[in-house]
Amino acid sequence: MANYYLGVDMGGTLIKIAIVDDKAAVIEEAVVNTDINANPKSVIENITEVFKKFKNYNKVKTIGIGIAGDIDFRQGIVRLSPNLPKWNKVQLKRDIEKITGKTVYVDNDANTAAIGAYWLDIKAKADNMICVTLGTGVGGGIIINKKLFRGNSGTAGEIGHITVEPNGRKCNCGNYGCAETYIGVRHIVKETVDLLKTNKSKYILKLANNDIEQITPKLLSQAAEKGDVVAKKVWNNAGEKLGILLSDIIDFFNPDYIVLCGGISNAGDLIIKPAKEQIKKRAFKTAAKACKIVVSKYTSHLGVVGAAMLVKN
């Protein structure tokens, strides 16, 4: 008889919930909207009500939750979450265990994405990998010998704050030149808007209906594929910074795989090709040759599956 685990991926706009078996296959799933203004108690009550609607809920052994922010994974406390401004020192593990009577695990969403990528993309191929999440921010999760590596205080994998441009753009963390300030969604869109002030674009504004608020990474990919010079420049710049970041990761960890996930990874070769050119120039050749860089085939499920499989980490 298969073991069942429940996973929760708490995002800034959506909360994904799924029951997963011991082979990481999704058995049941649901999606609910995230109310960022709601207090933690009401959010917890709402998602636990969703749990009970699953027909296999009574078979669930453990619950795992992935959430962005500063997480005390040992105590299951959300110290701070950028997606949920009212979540400050929330005893998430304690509160959900009290309601459900089941053991609960809580971790950073980049870590749960890494666990998901290992189980869904890599498990049959290798034991060591780095997952790089490319979205609003840039994050990472580290799998060594099939297990998540968290570091002393659970903050290992904060690769979005590795410097890729000394004395570069100021980051929200207080540092300058962090990878996140060049590869994150907000910064890619901002760079596009800045370039449009002095450069002619054939497709970007046309696709955006002359509204810069409609510019997205997906739109930029569409424009670049049509040959738009500005869009191609934006992706090339982001790809170069990504390549600098990945070169550091390759040199430091010598992983079998780097798995890219998140919305920015959907740009594919537009960002990966210039990244690989930088890796060829910068990374230690033996390590670079041994490392395969792939885009996850399961981006939409990595977080929720990884959360469910926290019990195994």
For each feature predicted by the language model, list its residue ranges.
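A charged helix-plus-loop insertion that forms the helical arch/lid used to bind
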Residues: V78-K89
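General beta-strand structural signal in soluble alpha/beta enzymes
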Residues: V104-N108
